Regions:
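Serine-dependent carboxylesterase/thioesterase catalytic core
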Residues: 1-51, 65-68, 73
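C-terminal catalytic-base region of ester-bond hydrolases, centering on the histidine
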Residues: 47-130
Length: 130
């Protein structure tokens, strides 16, 4: 596998997961992925080029479980999707669940899989490229 695209993945760990993990009544939701979701991944050093598409429409239940300091998709903060060693990173206007239905996210994923980088964003804002 040469290229991988992650959609809204909290590669750097998840505040929502850390908050869920604090209580026995909700920690079970995280299952066997608890440690990874709470702590994040080590810097990427694998052979495949990895790109992340993050969302910036803050909708979803995650807003009830965490207060994000910066932009988020309502479940995962944009900052939580960044990880040293990524080949590229971009953001689109979508919620966490909306990323899988977003035409812009699909177009960006296709560009990364084809070219190894995300397409330039027409209206570049402070969070559009990393």
């Amino acid at each position: 596998m040469r290229r991988v695209v992650c959609l809204g993945s909290p590669l750097h760990g998840s505040l929502v997961a850390r908050n869920l993990g604090r209580h026995r009544a909700t920690a079970w939701v995280l299952g066997r992925s608890r440690a990874l979701l709470q702590g994040g991944c080590p810097p990427w050093q694998g052979q495949a080029r990895v790109g992340v598409v993050a969302g910036t429409v803050a909708r979803g239940a995650g807003r009830l479980l965490a207060r994000f300091d910066g932009p988020s998709d309502g479940t995962v903060a944009v900052a939580e999707t960044r990880l040293p060693g990524l080949a590229d990173h971009c953001v689109v206007a979508a919620s966490h669940t909306g990323l899988v239905f977003s035409r812009e996210a699909a177009d960006q994923a296709a560009a990364f899989l084809r070219d190894g980088r995300f397409a330039p964003v027409a209206a570049a804002g402070p969070y559009n490229r990393a």
